[in-house]
Amino acid sequence: MMRGASRHSRRRRLARIVCVAVIAVMFVEASRGHARAASDSPIRGYWVPRAALDSVDTVRRVVNNAVAGAFDTVFVPIALTADASRGFDGAAELIREARDRHLRVQAWIDVNRVAVGDEFPASRAHVVYQHPEWLMVPRALAPELLTMDPRVPAYLGRLSRWTRSNRDRVDGLYMSPLDPEAASYVAGLVTESVQRYAVDGVYLDAVRFPGSDFDYSRRALDLFRSFERPRLSVGDRARLDEVEAIDPFGYPSEFPSEWAAFRQVRLTALLTRLHASLKLINPLLTVTASIAADDALAREEQFQDWRAWISDRLIDGVGRRNGNGITILLVPDGLLPEPTLLPAVGQASVGGSR
């Protein structure tokens, strides 16, 4: 009798711990008082397209659509640009309208992706123009870019053209988390953006590498070389010097496992900074992150150690792209979900959760 009661108790406890939420279809937030509705009924979330923030009319139209569709929450794209607050602030207007209509608000923020597809920034104050040396470089293009000064316009132009011609595998320009200065810049922008708006949670999109063949920029290679070199013997250093004389990828080629771990650790370090900054703004914010639809792709190609992110309480849940849209799984208290409870894997997409 006691054993049966224990099993029922465990089932009830598990049900309280994990709830699955399907964005654009339906999502259910986990059982935390600050992150859920007064009842345990499902909460419907409306994914706001960026184009809906262009004017007051489009903002009101999208809020009306959310209310008419019986959605309870809106996910609002927040731009990470230094001049995002100039002119009409569609995000602020949408949040005001949403609050007036008793809708909850989640901020949707691109982290490492700083330019999307063909939508490269017009303002020369944007980080892609001010610090092109911070942008990730694919290995295929690196031999050419390593011979160029990142400050000359031809450098960014070449990287942009390559990105446009490879849309099937990369969806924009990405800032590298390997450079400490770049990581500080990103963390600062995310903090400023969330401070500007009264939101209930933050969904971190594109907190990843586009693929395992990124980042082969000069700065990234130098950082990895500086990290590995002190651990080598004098003889190994001399040998690597000879290798580098003919192969600019000498250190990554000689130490592939360490190179992968280096990128994974630096990405996790960036997420750690983001989590600390966001919880300092508001400890009740839910922080979730987008991960690839395929688990191996997330770990081995995009360097997302998301299980450690959960167990270390860096995030409150994960989002996955599947055939039905975006699925968010909230996992409070750092408890890893059972594999069967993870969002089902559907179609993988280079574009992540866009």
Regions found by a protein language model. Give the residues of each.
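The substrate-binding groove and active-site-proximal loops of carbohydrate-active enzymes
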Residues: 45-53, 83-86, 169-184, 255-267, ...
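Boundary/entry segment of secreted carbohydrate-active catalytic domains
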Residues: 37-59, 291
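Catalytic domains of carbohydrate-active enzymes, especially glycoside hydrolases
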Residues: 58-82, 197, 317, 326
